[in-house]
């Protein structure tokens, strides 16, 4: 397929976006943002209601996707229109001490934040009875409907792509009076389930017990040790026997030591190294080194350059797990106080565990799935007001692999995408107050 013709609508959207910005209204000052257009909730000044602050928001965006189902042949493209609304409710911010020269911010004894949107809901609660102890409780629900397989490959059946994820967590936090030392221990329960019956074999729950200890030294540096134990169970074992891929209950451990801080006024980094292991009821186990290096340079207050490397081992529906080695770079610019532009690029070298079907036969033409995944994008946002923004993004995503699935028949596979390329473009307007 020729991707040049697919890219034309994306370039047209980007050109229109840039042209509009050049003749835009007088700007409002843009706040700092991360590396990418976040089309989720954004917070403005809010409406005060007693001790609570209400933050409503609404976003309208249109986009083009050259490969909706991430297929390697006979791609399906589409224009997409999305309307998203949300409402956040929060207690007021931290209170400042009126006495002393430090004027440090002190958290309120009770802090609350909650929100509800079309595909996202959250509740965050913190109880701070003293400066040295806190209790934090939170629950987050996310729902995605992004297609991950072509319904025409399953006997023409139409079904929902809805994937629901809920995470409930509790943390106990203790710290020294000087706040040099801080320790955390907690528990979380994650539940992941699909709408469609054909994907019910992938439903699972994960119990986690995280713990961490941080030591702050110098004004802007910290050493952090973290440990996590996770136990994952698939809730429909009988359906796994009839599914196309082998899924296994497992226990996972990971431990790491990292440094985070600013070395100079312009240069900062996060560096860490650790160990991860996974023990599965069936097929491959894993153990190995995990690492992270994230460098950040700000040659000017309006320019931020980031580059880094990640080595991680993550759960996967194929082969139990995937070992990932990823390189990435981002650049963010603020122009005229209101226009934010950014670039992002990444490449990841991934390898799965032994990819098997439930009957023990190979899932594909090779024992292990190996991929090179590439991503790139250009994005921007223009603030007309402190609560009104125009945003746009053009992106590229690709997966290169020699792995091919064998003998799947009509059985639908979770996330089968392999050997694809996709261009997409988005343009939208959002109000957040």
Residue ranges and their predicted role:
Residues 1-10:
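N-terminal secretory signal peptides that target proteins for export/translocation
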Residues 2, 19-20, 49:
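Residue-level detector of alpha-helical transmembrane segments in integral membrane proteins
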Residues 12-26:
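Bacterial N-terminal signal peptides
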Residues 24-34:
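Boundary at the C-terminal end of the N-terminal hydrophobic targeting segment
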Residues 32-433:
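Gram-negative and organellar
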């Amino acid at each position: 397929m020729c991707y040049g013709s697919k890219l034309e609508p994306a370039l047209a959207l980007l050109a229109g976006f840039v042209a509009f910005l050049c003749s835009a209204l007088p700007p409002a000052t843009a706040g700092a943002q991360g590396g990418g257009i976040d089309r989720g909730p954004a917070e403005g000044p809010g409406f005060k209601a007693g001790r609570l602050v209400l933050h409503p928001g609404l976003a309208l965006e249109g986009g083009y996707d050259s490969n909706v189902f991430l297929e390697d042949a006979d791609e399906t493209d589409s224009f997409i229109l999305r309307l998203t609304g949300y409402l956040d409710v929060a207690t007021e911010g931290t209170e400042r001490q009126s006495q002393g020269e430090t004027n440090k911010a002190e958290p309120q004894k009770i802090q609350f934040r909650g929100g509800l949107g079309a595909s996202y809901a959250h509740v965050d609660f913190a109880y701070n009875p003293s400066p040295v102890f806190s209790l934090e409780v939170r629950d987050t629900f996310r729902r995605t409907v992004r297609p991950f397989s072509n319904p025409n490959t399953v006997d023409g059946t139409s079904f929902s792509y809805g994937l629901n994820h809920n995470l409930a967590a509790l943390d106990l936090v203790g710290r020294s009076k000087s706040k040099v030392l801080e320790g955390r221990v907690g528990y979380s329960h994650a539940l992941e389930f699909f709408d469609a019956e054909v994907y019910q074999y992938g439903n699972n729950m994960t119990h986690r017990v995280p713990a961490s200890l941080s030591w702050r030294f110098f004004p802007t540096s910290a050493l952090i040790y973290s440990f996590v134990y996770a136990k994952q169970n698939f809730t429909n074992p009988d359906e796994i026997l009839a599914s196309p891929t082998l899924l296994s209950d497992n226990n996972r451990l990971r431990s790491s030591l990292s440094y985070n801080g600013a070395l100079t006024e312009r240069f900062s980094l996060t560096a860490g190294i650790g160990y991860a292991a996974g023990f599965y009821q069936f097929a491959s186990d894993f153990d190995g080194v995990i690492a992270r290096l994230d460098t950040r340079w700000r040659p000017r207050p309006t320019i931020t350059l980031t580059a880094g490397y990640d080595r991680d081992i993550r759960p996967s529906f194929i082969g139990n797990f995937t070992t990932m080695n990823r390189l990435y770079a981002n650049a963010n610019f603020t122009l005229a106080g209101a226009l934010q532009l950014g670039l992002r690029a990444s490449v990841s070298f991934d390898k799965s565990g032994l990819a098997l079907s439930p009957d023990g036969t190979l899932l594909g033409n090779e024992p292990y799935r190996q991929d090179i995944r590439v991503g790139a994008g250009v994005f921007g946002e223009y603030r007309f007001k402190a609560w009104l923004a125009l945003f746009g993004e053009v992106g590229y995503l690709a997966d290169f692999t020699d792995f091919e699935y064998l003998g799947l028949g009509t059985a639908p596979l979770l996330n089968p995408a392999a050997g694809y390329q996709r261009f997409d473009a988005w343009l939208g307007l959002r109000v957040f107050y």
